[in-house]
Amino acid sequence: TIKVPEGFDYELYNRNDINRYVDAVLTIPKVICDHLGLGVKTGLPYIWHSKASNPFVNLK
């Protein structure tokens, strides 16, 4: 994970066709966090959880 500095944009998707619009929309929370003085990080999560059980079996 990397900390995205205040005032800098970060790219979540490749900039092509519809993905560039998705990336533009996802920039809005970053601008809000910058305004509120909150940090934003991007990348893989610190803790990776994988379920050992099958959720469909658990529903029975």
Curated annotation (Swiss-Prot):
Keywords: Allergen, Cell junction, Cell wall, Cell wall biogenesis/degradation, Cellulose biosynthesis, Golgi apparatus, Isomerase, Secreted
Biological process according to GO: cell wall organization; cellulose biosynthetic process; UDP-L-arabinose metabolic process
GO molecular function term, any single one: UDP-arabinopyranose mutase activity
Enzyme class: isomerase
Pfam family, one: RGP
Cell compartment(s), UniProt: Secreted, Cell wall; Cell junction, Plasmodesma; Golgi apparatus
Keyword Cell wall biogenesis/degradation: yes
A Gene Ontology term for the protein's cellular component: plasmodesma
Main location as per UniProt: secreted
UniProt family annotation: Belongs to the RGP family.
Additional comment: On the 2D-gel the determined pI of this protein is: 6.24, its MW is: 20 kDa.
Identification of the protein by name: Probable UDP-arabinopyranose mutase 1
Native source species: Phoenix dactylifera (Date palm)
